[in-house]
Amino acid sequence: MSSVPAPREYFLDSIRAWLMLLGIPFHISLIYSTHSWHVNSAAPSWWLTLFNDFIHAFRMQVFFVISGYFSYMLFLRYPLKRWWKVRVERVGIPMLTAIPLLTLPQFILLQYVKEKTENWPTLSAYEKYNTLAWELISHLWFLLVLVILTTVSIGIFTWFQKRQETSKPRPAAISLAKLSLIFFLLGIAYAAIRRIIFIVYPAILSDGMFNFIVMQTLFYVPFFILGALAFIHPDLKARFTTPSRGCTLGAAVAFIAYLLNQRYGSGDAWMYETESVITMVMGLWMVNVVFSLGHRLLNFQSARVTYFVNASLFIYLVHHPLTLFFGAYITPHITSNLIGFLCGLIFVMGIALILYEIHLRIPLLKFLFSGKPPVKQESRAAIG
């Protein structure tokens, strides 16, 4: 445990916040894309589909690298039990709060919008359970994965710490090319696991909890560990904060491959396995692209940026039901996809910010949506 706090990583704080807030244009553009969602516009937009695919191809990989970075930083700062408790509370409490307050009403709304209320009694017990698993976890899935990764990483982080204490500091002798090969092989390994499951027991891949707890965790754990290693080895972090033409070109080629796979791939064939390999390496390359841009443009302290850093989780939590409401009741009345998309951004962001300001003034809600207990104000002793 270290009592000396690490210097503030302003650009990483900012990147994490903007990746969270990107969820708003991501889900609003999903309404206007060619992808089938809960609610869709009458006519899809090719450029909003392209925009949506680009965000989806890299956003969460970069997010989990940053999460791993900060998780290990705090691991060195707190005793083990306190670290686990703090980390799980910070993500677990908002997740458990959002289920009854946000995703349950969202589920009920969708039942009426999609006219499925009459079909609910006809579902089997498992079908009801699985539907609720998908719909109640919904956009909160990454919080569940973070709880799992935090728990799993106890042993891994402890091993990292012991190696730091017993070994002399040395550079992480690994290039971006070697990392690319490693993540390519990890993508193939993940694809192989999925294909084996598809052959042996394909039905389990449609199970919501299995998808969130097992498949999503398996995919994102390399990025989480990479973030921790970037904290341990400053030279590794420097590789990500230094612009790489190879990573930029590689990410562009990977995105083209991603689009081609989306266009010509088949879910009954190898589309999902191919996508996992592509997004694994593209995620790595986009870490370099995003970190280097963020380090150059966002590595400063700003009250406005700090506001959105603090607000990003709450805004992300509430934006999803707001987006679905907009898509169900407002989108049909707007003929232009561009105007609809812009109106959606204003509608969702505006209401989310109002709700954020309201919740800040209610201590219980502030705690439930942040997982942070209220800070006790120490009384000052009067000086005579």
Swiss-Prot record:
GO terms for molecular function: acyltransferase activity, transferring groups other than amino-acyl groups; transferase activity, transferring one-carbon groups. GO terms for biological process: glucan biosynthetic process. It is found in: Cell membrane. The keyword Cell membrane applies. It holds the Pfam family Acyl_transf_3. Its main location: membrane. It is a multi-pass membrane protein. Its EC number is 2.1.-.-. Keywords: Acyltransferase, Cell membrane, Membrane, Transferase, Transmembrane, Transmembrane helix. The chain crosses the membrane at residues 17-37, 54-74, 91-111, 140-160, 173-193, 212-232, 240-260, 274-294, 311-331, 338-358. Pathway: Glycan metabolism; osmoregulated periplasmic glucan (OPG) biosynthesis. GO terms for cellular component: plasma membrane. It comes from the Bacteria. The keyword ATP-binding does not apply. Belongs to the acyltransferase 3 family. OpgC subfamily. Necessary for the succinyl substitution of periplasmic glucans. Could catalyze the transfer of succinyl residues from the cytoplasmic side of the membrane to the nascent glucan backbones on the periplasmic side of the membrane. This is Glucans biosynthesis protein C. It comes from Salmonella schwarzengrund (strain CVM19633). The gene is mdoC.
